[in-house]
Amino acid sequence: DKDSYKVSGGLHGVGVSCVNALSTDMKVTVYSHGKVHQQEYKKGIPQYDVKEIGESEIHGTKVQFLPDDSIFTSSEYKYETIANRLRELSFLNKGIRITLQDHREVDADGKSEIETFHSEGGLREFVEYVDSTRERLIPRPLYMESDKGPIPVEVAMLYNTSYSENVFSYVNNINTVEGGTHVAGFRRALTRTLKSYADKSGMLEKLKMEVTGDDFREGLTAVISVKVQEPQFEGQTKTKLGNSDVMGAVDQVVGEMLNTYLEENPKEAKIIVQKVILAAQARNAARKAREMVQRKNVLSGSGLPGKLADCSESDPEKCEIYLVEGDSAGGSAKQGRDRKYHAILPLRGKILNVEKAQEHRIYENDEIKNMITALGVSFGTEEGEKVLNLTKLRYHKVIIMTDADIDGSHIRTLILTFFFRYMRALIDGGHVYIAQPPLYLVKRGKEEKYCWTEEQREVAVKELAKDGKEDSVGIQRY
């Protein structure tokens, strides 16, 4: 409805209709043109026609609803989820002020938690917020904005010393997590403009390899926001934009403004191009290291790691591999496994933090090489070097089993980070599991109870000491 809004994230009113249908009670109050109008609903049915209930100089709409507990087994709202979304909106709409108040809990003074989100810098501050824990390569965010054409475009970007790309894209304030034409336009302009500048500067002359789009985006954090009057999303969840004209609009704005920035800031431009060259060299070294790992596997027959205690079953769907912390844990795991279905691979110490390492270093790490070899997967397909080939996956359940302490948690995080960055298909395919070790073994005589929380431990002690003799209950902490 262009008479009400120039652009809108909602397209058909499905959202409010669904909220109404799934609520026992809903009340909508509209403040507009000096008047206040209201309508109430129960189980989706209007209780009366829209009526005027007063006058007011404020503008806006207030929606109050109560989820239907006959439909939802749980309707607890996560404060952090709501806060993150409102913070996001304050960055995307600079200058506005959004207040979040949680009335569910109050302090000793009877006050509830309240938080205000406000940003004068908009996307500049958004990028700085996202990159707050990373080391910058350029001092300030590169900011591009244009509302001259039919599609307003706003982009902010920073380069950092990491080896990953983080691009956040929005259409009419909706987070398009799968990207779309606006992201494609941004990437196309970024690659073309940076390559053109690098070629003219002569910095690529000594590089004896082709530079790819991935090289230009290594260490990049960017936020893209476009306003589209008639957005075409792929799917009802609105996670990917499909408007073809948006690609050209973003491409033009980013291409022109990025080129101007590079010409006016030669020092920063040189730093960015040097980062691109390092990325290309690391990618080439990683390709050679990856090929070497896979070639060794082929030449050495099965090539399975020496510490792997494999299972006898040949059907991958029935097989499980446990990645365990250290040789001693590996020994315990071997004693408790079913040899037919369970394989055990002990990992020595903490594996490499792939988030802070160049790719070729990853393939040189023994523990990571052992994991790759044991899983049987190969990297690189016709679609691209980073695509994981799962056709040779030897175990359809990959279970991370570390200790219940801080070190165990850290090792688990490092393994998950490796899978997320380099074996994402394992996670997306539902192959990765985490074994949750117990914190306590509570024992009295031949009776044993494993406990995962303090509360469970207390209950177990009481159950085993019904005669009141708690001193006779042994507690072992893992």
UniProtKB/Swiss-Prot annotation:
It comes from Cytophaga aurantiaca. It catalyses: ATP-dependent breakage, passage and rejoining of double-stranded DNA. Its cofactor is Mg(2+); Mn(2+); Ca(2+). Its EC number is 5.6.2.2. It is found in: Cytoplasm. The lineage of its organism: Bacteria, Pseudomonadati, Bacteroidota, Cytophagia, Cytophagales. Belongs to the type II topoisomerase GyrB family. This is DNA gyrase subunit B. A type II topoisomerase that negatively supercoils closed circular double-stranded (ds) DNA in an ATP-dependent manner to modulate DNA topology and maintain chromosomes in an underwound state. Negative supercoiling favors strand separation, and DNA replication, transcription, recombination and repair, all of which involve strand separation. Also able to catalyze the interconversion of other topological isomers of dsDNA rings, including catenanes and knotted rings. Type II topoisomerases break and join 2 DNA strands simultaneously in an ATP-dependent manner. CDD domains: TopoII_Trans_DNA_gyrase, TOPRIM_TopoIIA_GyrB.
